[in-house]
Amino acid sequence: MLKEFKEFAMKGNVVDMAVGIIVGGAFGTIVNTLVSQVLMPPLGLLIGGVDFTNLYLILKEGSKAAAPYAALADATAAGAVTVNYGLFLNSVISFLIMAFAVFLLVKAINMLRREEKAPPLAPTTKECPYCLSIVPLKATRCSSCTSELGK
């Protein structure tokens, strides 16, 4: 049982997949940081100083403090029920950047990959030199004109 597991785990595809998952997780963290810390603050500034992480709708005020709340953290601390659409926008933008990066990566790999052409198949037929009909390669006599064919 252990030997079978070792063979399975050491197959190239399993190891490649594990490396891909680890690198993908790290890349996801980088993209999320890029979106939340680099892209969204200037975008929020351009559209009027809005912090996207603090965009939310209050469904029910909190029991500890009444609305309005200065930030999402204040609403959450007060026990308010909220729809956090700003965080959702950050996630959508992160996904779009991640999808575009994967697209560029796949496109680059496909450009580098050379199409391997299959070797030409060995001929299985030949042409009769007398009547020009097609006969099997191993034939010694033409089936159409009955001429003797050389080996």
Curated annotation (Swiss-Prot):
CC annotations in GO: plasma membrane
Protein name, as recorded: Large-conductance mechanosensitive channel
GO molecular function: mechanosensitive monoatomic ion channel activity
Residue stretches spanning the membrane: 14-34, 38-58, 86-106
InterPro entries associated with the record: Mechanosensitive_channel_CS, MS_channel, MSC/AndL, MscL_channel
HAMAP family registered for this protein in UniProt: MscL
Keywords tagged on the record: Cell inner membrane, Cell membrane, Ion channel, Ion transport, Membrane, Transmembrane, Transmembrane helix, Transport
Domain of life of the native organism: Bacteria
Protein's organism: Pelodictyon phaeoclathratiforme (strain DSM 5477 / BU-1)
PROSITE patterns: MSCL
Pfam families for this protein: MscL
Protein's membrane topology: Multi-pass membrane protein
Function: Channel that opens in response to stretch forces in the membrane lipid bilayer. May participate in the regulation of osmotic pressure changes within the cell.
Location of this chain's protein in the cell: Cell inner membrane
Subunit structure: Homopentamer.
UniProt similarity note: Belongs to the MscL family.
Gene3D superfamilies assigned: Large-conductance mechanosensitive channel, MscL, domain 1
